Each structure stands twice: as structure tokens, then as C-alpha cells.
């Protein structure tokens, strides 16, 4: 006996369960690690500072990531072509060249390719995995056009087109027409002033970066395409929801905040960490603008764009479905064959979706270096403004407490005032800092002497001579990151763009 189709209420319940148990959900270990990485990237205080003591914070995480990015961007974006399609046979040469030109045009011209690549790599280096979303956007683009003095025939010819929508229309009489009227003309000649919008084309490939805090994936997943559940949660205004789903009856009273956890997501520590450096999130409670919150069209709701494998029709075979949910309302429920997200990570862990970020490797070094520098600076303060032993009644304490160049201290007997020795830490601290820099170089593949990568280092025709030009074994770590990005993320993105067109 065949099972019945899943109801909308059952779908919403299933989706909520998948969201709360997914990786990247607010408050889980992945989310906390990414929040901590953002704090280290901004070199924010650790929370263990002592008043009156040094509060120095080292910037190892941000320095290392910012040193790696130029090498990666030079490898991927220094030339005119982000991707090149190779022909299989001689007959494929024209098609391969055309595909190369068109995909590069879509990525660099139709979309902000450089910005996408830069943000993608930054997310991966800092937050374990960088995520981009690529899809075919069927939203119509309309151009505004204005015409004046059209005759009746011209006007009818214009507005009869299916790709034209009239915005404004004014009928005017031609000047001097009464004097020129003949007996055959029973009506005066009229002209038309009209403003229209013309459909400039339907659909294009759209690529956008997905903030790590907005991406969810089922815990057992090894990659995106094989995952049971993937979700992109994003804030949308009521106006945007109505534009996206014009055929749906969207009632603000039934949407709530877009889900039972909407309040928690608005104040998610991981999301707010991105704004913590300049405290730019302090005035809007995590999202939105309080000044416009009362305007209905600008009220914001959490939209969950979910890709779920489920036996929706009850035939015993699961299919991949795209479900867009706001609160308890399902706005879209379609069967699809592709999940439009692509991920890359600098250090891939086999059989696991989330890898390791560069920040994961060196955050402990930043804490140790900060502690050493604080101790070193406190030691220098103590040397410059040390402590003294004073024989009671044998020295003038006011003179001793008054710090001024060339000042004197009146004493009644020699040796009444003696300085307490403060051991110097400089030689040992600097040696330790150099040792930590060496550890950072071996872990992250970057040092203060690194000059980046050869732009030809990763190409297929690389010779033994070119490989020998690598200055140190540490730089091979950066090369491996670049190759990993190319094989697991960039190549897949270009392939998807090609398949969409």
C-alpha cells in the first residue's frame, strides 16, 4: 500500500528538526570556534586582562591570513582568464574557446568575480569553509523608456509587444491641427506621450558569497551534493518576500519572526562577532534598523532555503526538494536535481565536510605571544618604575614618591633607600617569540620573509626547474592550499556556471 504524501505541517516539523541538529547551528562547537576565530582575527582582548597591567594583544591570526591571501589571489586572479576549458579533440577547439570566453565573462562581468573570490578565500582561511551560492536567476530585468509625440500607429505598435508594460500615458492634440482639418477629417489628429518598461532579458547566472553563520548542513555529511539536508537562512523584508513569491498570500500576522528560533538567530554570537571590532551592531539588536521596524514592508523575517532529501510523494524513493520556509509557511516546494552551494576549505579532513582553517592552527600561538609580550612589557615597566626598600624614618618619603628627572631623595643615613632588583626577561622572551614564529611558519606556510607564489607554479606544464624555485618547504603549504582550492572549489564553480548556461 502506497504511503500518503507528506503534509505541509510534517515538512515544517522535519525542517525544524534538521535545522536544530545541523552543523553550524548557533551555539554548537563549529559556531563557537568560528566566533572565536573572528575575535582573534580582530585581535580583541581575551577577557583575562588585569587592570593596571599590560593588555597587549598580538595579531598573529590576521597577519598570517592577510599574508596568504595575496599569494592565492595572484595564482587565481592575476591573468585575464579565471578558467580555461581544454578541448578533448581537434573538433572541440572552437567550442572550448567559446566556453572559456563566456564563463569568464559571466564570472568577471555579470558578477563581481574579484570580490566573490576574495571573500570566498577569506571565509575559508578564517572560518573553516568558504561557501558560495550559484544559481540561474529567472527574475525579469526591466528598462525604463520614454517616448513623446507618437502617432496612433506607432503607439499601437509599441504597446502591443508582450515585453512592454505601460507606466504612464498622455494623449495630446497636435498644434495647429484645427486649421489643417479637411472635410474628410472628422476628428483632430492626436499624439501620444508614453513611459514604458521593456523586458531586457529573462534570467542570468548569479553568484554570491554565503556568510558561514547562515549555512547549515546535516552532521553526517561529507560533501554538499550528498548531504541529506542543506539550508541557507537569510533575512528578507516583507516587501522582498512578496516580490519573490507574488502568487503566495503572505500575511504578516502568520509569519511571526520567521521561526521559533528567530530571536536567538538575531542575537547569534557568531553573527554579532563580525561587528564586534567597531561595535557597529550595538544599536540594532543584531539586525535591522529600529527606525523602520514599524513600517510593514520593511519588517524582516528569516527565510530558510532548504534542500532536503525526502520521500515527499510516498513512493518509497527519496528525492531532492527545494523548500523555502518562513515561520510555519512553505512558500516554495519543488523537486530539484542540484544543490546550488560550493564549498572550499584550506585543510581538508577526509570523510568530513568541515575542514580546518588557518586560524584553527595558530590561535594558540596568538594567545602565547600575547602573554609573553604582556609579561615583557610589565617587566620593562617594573624596571623603569621599580620598587624600593626604605629604612623607616631614615628617608623623606615625599621625595621618594615624587618622580621627576634630576630629583633628589633626602636620607639620614647611607643605604636608607635601596632598589629591589627586577630580573630582565628580554633575551629569553625574544628567543621564545622567534621560536613561536618558526612554529607559525611550519603550521601555516608563511613567514615574514615569504614573498608569495610563482603564478606558474600550479600549471600543468610545470617543470622540475620551476618546482626548484620554491624558496622553502614551508611555502609548499600555501601551494597545497591553492591547489586544494582549485580542485575542490574553483573548478566546481566554473563547471556549474557552464552547466547553467
Labelled PLM ranges:
Residues 362:
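His/Asp/Glu-rich acidic catalytic environments and adjacent acidic regulatory segments
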